[in-house]
C-alpha cells in the first residue's frame, strides 16, 4: 500500500521539538511521501533537522486549521496514494513499532478511513483538551487516515473547499474550521463512508469518551497503542478530575519510563520549553512527600557525593531566635550555614546562639532594604554559585492578621515542609540527586483560615510586576495570568543552584528594592516571590512541591474538611446539586466549540448538529475487541 503522511506542525514559532523529530523519522519509514506543513516559517533552530526528516515542507500563511488543505493543494501526489495519514504534532511516539499498526489496518481494505482510537467527544462530553502551549486557541484533527476511494470523491473535495473558502482565512473563522476538523470522521460516517479505529477499547474501557486523556496507561499496556497525545501532560487538573482521580498522566509516564523503549526525556524537553509549570506539575503529580524519621539513602548523600550544600537564613526578629535555632539544628553537620541580619547587635545574638552547632556558621550584616529577598540576592549572591544545593529560610511574623496563631501556623507549615528534621534534609538532597531535572522545591501555598483565599488567587495583584521581571531577566518559560505560579508563598524553599543561576547573576543592588514600609502587594518583593519557578524552568529544570509526611497528613485532612464545609453550606442553602455539577463538570458550559459549530450550521452538507452527534461506526472488530 502506497502511503502519504501529512504532518501538521502546530508550534506557533515553527519549532520542532525532539519528540516531533523522533515521530517524523519513524513515520518516514512507513511512508512513501512525508509532507510537513507549518503555519509560517520553520524555526531556524530546527529547520535543518526537519528538512532532513521529511520529503516536502509546505508553508501555510493562513490559519492553522488550513494546514492540511494547504498540503493537499500544493502536493498533488497525495490524492494518488492508496492511503494518506493526517497527523499533527499533538502526538508523540512511537512507543511501539508503527509497522504493527499499519500492517493490521492494511488488512481492513473495506475501510474508507480509520483513526487511532474511537472519536470520543459529544454534546454530553465536550472536548476536554487545552490547546497545545504556544499555538493559537483552537483544536485540530490529530490523526486520521483516508483511503484512495474517499480522497477521490467529490465529498472529500467539497469538505476542503468549504473549509478554505474566502472569508475563512482568519484565526477567528478558523475556530469553526477547527471544530469541523475535529469531527471530520463523524461527517464522513454520517454520509455513508465506512470508518474504523486501530484500537477499539472494550470490557468497560469503551465507556470513557476520552481515552487518550483519561486512560493512556491502559492504552499503552493493554492495547499497545503506539502514539499518544502529549496534551495529557498539560491538561489542567480540574478537567482531569471531571472523570478520574487525577492519576492518568503520572501513572502513564512512570509506566512508559519503566518499559524503557521510548526516551521520556523528549517529553520533559518539551514540557520545560513550552508548557506552563502549574499544568505539568499538577497533571504529573509532582509533589515530593518525604519522611521525617526514616532515612531513604543508606549514607549521607552530601558526603558520599562530595556535594556542597548550605542553609541560607535571614533573621530579623530576635524574639523568634529560639525557633530559628531549632530550625537550624535540623541541618546535617555536612551542611554549611550562612545567616544574614540587619544590625551588629542582632549578629552577636545569632553568633552566640549558633555557637554550639557543629556546622560551619557565618553571620553577615545586610541592609534591611529588600528584606529577605535582597538578603539572599545581594548579601549572599557571591557564595551561592559555590554550592550545589541550598535551603533558604527566613523568620516570619505576620502582625496584620489576627489572631496571631494564623500567621504562626503558616510559619510552622513552611518549617514542616522544608526542614523538620536532620533526616528530612538528607532525603531532600537524595530526591534532587535522583531527579537531575529537579531545580526548585517549595511548600504548597497556605490555605488555612485567612489564607484560604489563596488557591485561585495566587497572583493577587502581582501578575503585571512579575511579568515585567520575567522580561527583564530574559526568561523563556511560559507565563500567563490564567496559569498560577508554582511559587513559594513565604519564600522558604530548596533549590539547585544551577536552576536559579540567572537570578543570582543579575547583579542586584539594595537600591533596586523598595524602601520601608513595603506595600502588602504589587512590589518587587512579591514579584521575586513568584518568579523563582520561571527562572528554574528557563534554566532547563522543573519546579515541584515539597512536603514532609507530617505536613501531608495535615494538608490532606485540612483540604477534605474545607471541601466538606463548602458542601454543607451548599446543602443548607439548597444548592448542593448545582455545586456538585460545578465540581464534576467545571467547563461544560464553557465548551468552546459549541458556538463555533453554531456559526457554521447549515453550511451545505456540513450540519453542525450532525457533527456533534455523529458516531463512527467501525464495521469490524478492532484491536482489543472480542
Locate each region found by the language model:
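ER/Golgi luminal nucleotide-sugar-dependent glycosyltransferases, focusing on the catalytic module
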Residues: 1-623
Amino acid at each position: 500500500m502506497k502511503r502519504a503522511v501529512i504532518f501538521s506542525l502546530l508550534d506557533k514559532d515553527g519549532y520542532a521539538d525532539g519528540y516531533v523529530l523522533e515521530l517524523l523519522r519513524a513515520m518516514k519509514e512507513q511512508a512513501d511521501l512525508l509532507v510537513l506543513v507549518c503555519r509560517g516559517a520553520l524555526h531556524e533552530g530546527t529547520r535543518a533537522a526537519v528538512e532532513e526528516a521529511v520529503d516536502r515542507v509546505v508553508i501555510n500563511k493562513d490559519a492553522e486549521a488550513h494546514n492540511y488543505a494547504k498540503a493537499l493543494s500544493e502536493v498533488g501526489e497525495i490524492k494518488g496514494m492508496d492511503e494518506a495519514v493526517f497527523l499533527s504534532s499533538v502526538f508523540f511516539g512511537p512507543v511501539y513499532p508503527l509497522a504493527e499498526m499499519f500492517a493490521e489496518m492494511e488488512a481492513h481494505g473495506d475501510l474508507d478511513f480509520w483513526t487511532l482510537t474511537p472519536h470520543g467527544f459529544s454534546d454530553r462530553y465536550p472536548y476536554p483538551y487545552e490547546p497545545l502551549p504556544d499555538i493559537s486557541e483552537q483544536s485540530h484533527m490529530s490523526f486520521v487516515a483516508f483511503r484512495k476511494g474517499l480522497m477521490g470523491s467529490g465529498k472529500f473535495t467539497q469538505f476542503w473547499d468549504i473549509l478554505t473558502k474566502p472569508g475563512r482565512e482568519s484565526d477567528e473563522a478558523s475556530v469553526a474550521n477547527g471544530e469541523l476538523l475535529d469531527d471530520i470522521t463523524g461527517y464522513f460516517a454520517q454520509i455513508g463512508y465506512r470508518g474504523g479505529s486501530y484500537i477499539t477499547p472494550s470490557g468497560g474501557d469503551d465507556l470513557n469518551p476520552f481515552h487518550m486523556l483519561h486512560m493512556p496507561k491502559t492504552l499503552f499496556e493493554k492495547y499497545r497503542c503506539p502514539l499518544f497525545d502529549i496534551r495529557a501532560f498539560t491538561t489542567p487538573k480540574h478537567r482531569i478530575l471531571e472523570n478520574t482521580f487525577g492519576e492518568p498522566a503520572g501513572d502513564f509516564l512512570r509506566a512508559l519510563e519503566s518499559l524503557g523503549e521510548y526516551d521520556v526525556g523528549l517529553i520533559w524537553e518539551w514540557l520545560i520549553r513550552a508548557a506552563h509549570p502549574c499544568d505539568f506539575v499538577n497533571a504529573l503529580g509532582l509533589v515530593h512527600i518525604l519522611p521525617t524519621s526514616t532515612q531513604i539513602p543508606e549514607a549521607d548523600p552530601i558526603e558520599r557525593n562530595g556535594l556542597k550544600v548550605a542553609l541560607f537564613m535571614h533573621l530579623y526578629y530576635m524574639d523568634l531566635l529560639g525557633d530559628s535555632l531549632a530550625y537550624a539544628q535540623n541541618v546535617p553537620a555536612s551542611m554549611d550555614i550562612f545567616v544574614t541580619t540587619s544590625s551588629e547587635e542582632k549578629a552577636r545574638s545569632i553568633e552566640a546562639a549558633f555557637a554550639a552547632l557543629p556546622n560551619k556558621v557565618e553571620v553577615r550584616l545586610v541592609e534591611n532594604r529588600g528584606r529577605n529577598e535582597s538578603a539572599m540576592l545581594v548579601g549572599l549572591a557571591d557564595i551561592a554559585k559555590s554550592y550545589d544545593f541550598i535551603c533558604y529560610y527566613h523568620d516570619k511574623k505576620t502582625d496584620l492578621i489576627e489572631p496571631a496563631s494564623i500567621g504562626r501556623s503558616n510559619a510552622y507549615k513552611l518549617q514542616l515542609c522544608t526542614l523538620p528534621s536532620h533526616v528530612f534534609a538528607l532525603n531532600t538532597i537524595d530526591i534532587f540527586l535522583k531527579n537531575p531535572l529537579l531545580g526548585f522545591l517549595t511548600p504548597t501555598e497556605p490555605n488555612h483560615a485567612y489564607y484560604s483565599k489563596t488557591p485561585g488567587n495566587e497572583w493577587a495583584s502581582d501578575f503585571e510586576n512579575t511579568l515585567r521581571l520575567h522580561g527583564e531577566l530574559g526568561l523563556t518559560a511560559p507565563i500567563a495570568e490564567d496559569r498560577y505560579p508554582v511559587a513559594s508563598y513565604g519564600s522558604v524553599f530548596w533549590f539547585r543552584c544551577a536552576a536559579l543561576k540567572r537570578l543570582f547573576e543579575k547583579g542586584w543592588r539594595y537600591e533596586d528594592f523598595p524602601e520601608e514600609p513595603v506595600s502588602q502587594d504589587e512590589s518587587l518583593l512579591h514579584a521575586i516571590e513568584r518568579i523563582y519557578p520561571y527562572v528554574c524552568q528557563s534554566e532547563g529544570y522543573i519546579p515541584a512541591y515539597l512536603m514532609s509526611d507530617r505536613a501531608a497528613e495535615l494538608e490532606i485532612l485540612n483540604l477534605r474538611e474545607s471541601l466538606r464545609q463548602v458542601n454543607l453550606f451548599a446543602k443548607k442553602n439548597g444548592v448542593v446539586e448545582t455545586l456538585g455539577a460545578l465540581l464534576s463538570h467545571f467547563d461544560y458550559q464553557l465548551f468552546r466549540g459549541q458556538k463555533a459549530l453554531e456559526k457554521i450550521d447549515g453550511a451545505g452538507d456540513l450540519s453542525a448538529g450532525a457533527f456533534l452527534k455523529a458516531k463512527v461506526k467501525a464495521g469490524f472488530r478492532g484491536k482489543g475487541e472480542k
